[in-house]
Amino acid sequence: AALEALDSLEASIAPIPSKTRKTFLLGMVRSLRAAVRLFSGEHLSYQAKLTDLVGVPAEPVPDETIAALHDELNVLMTRLGYTTGTLGERVRTWQTGRYLEPEAIPAVFEELMAEAQRRTDAMIWPTGDYTMRLNAVRNVPYAGRCSFEEGNMDINLDVRVTRAAMKHLVAHEVFPGHSTQLLSTRAVVERGEASPDALLCTVNAVTGAMQEGIGDQGIDLIDWVEDENDAAQIGVRRLQTAAGTNAAWHLHVSGWTKAQSIAYLCEVGFAQESWSKVRTGMALHPFRGPFLASYWFGNETVKSLRERADGKREHLLDHLYRHVHSIESLRMALA
């Protein structure tokens, strides 16, 4: 019955005149159809999950791209004065010297949250009195997560964080990331400025890559890169989302073991073992796993559009925060 309803819905989309909107809605139907088939017990190949469920290319990140990300990090580590040892050793030395002690995290969190909200209110969307409380957790399969309705931001204390990494989490999860996107889309729908499907930005479907792209570009969207440490953290994040995309691919397509995935994330992505175990666990989930690719492809999409926005920044922000998109429809809207 669900698949028949989706067939009927797909047919109703055909007359829509807007090519961009039609592209998004057809992508959503395709994604929902894949989810229905998956939760009905049908087997879907990992490649089909990527293209149909997540709406990203069915391919790993090329080795050449990984090498280029390493080269960029090498330049940043050199600028920061870390020139001895392998690149991985230099990155870990840089991080280790800046890890926050658990007892220091609440104060740093409050400081960063206030500044992120100030910048978001000025540059993206007025967030009003919305805020998030820190909720420290352990033994969970994520580094950070926001609960919009409860107003909690979970921070996994099993994964050590620097100030720059905490800044990324705040920007990704709250201001101007996930929470801000939810606040803005809810407001425009309530005011009648957008159709209710704008609220689909929260769904794990082809919209997921846009959520993660906005989150990972959060620091840049509010012009919050303050020093080389922030730039290095962004470089590490891009590398690790690329490595996470590849680890998930090889677990499902190449027959990698958990141990191989963890080793790859540590050795190629320069990740902590605790984070690598968390990511590998997520990658192995039959539904959640393919969405790991949404971080890489979503970030690269929003990054490329932001970098060439020039005088059309408001047009970009309008589509990121007041509309709902897939990667394909966003590129089409901003072409």
List PLM regions with ranges:
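N-terminal maturation segment of proteins
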Residues: 1-335
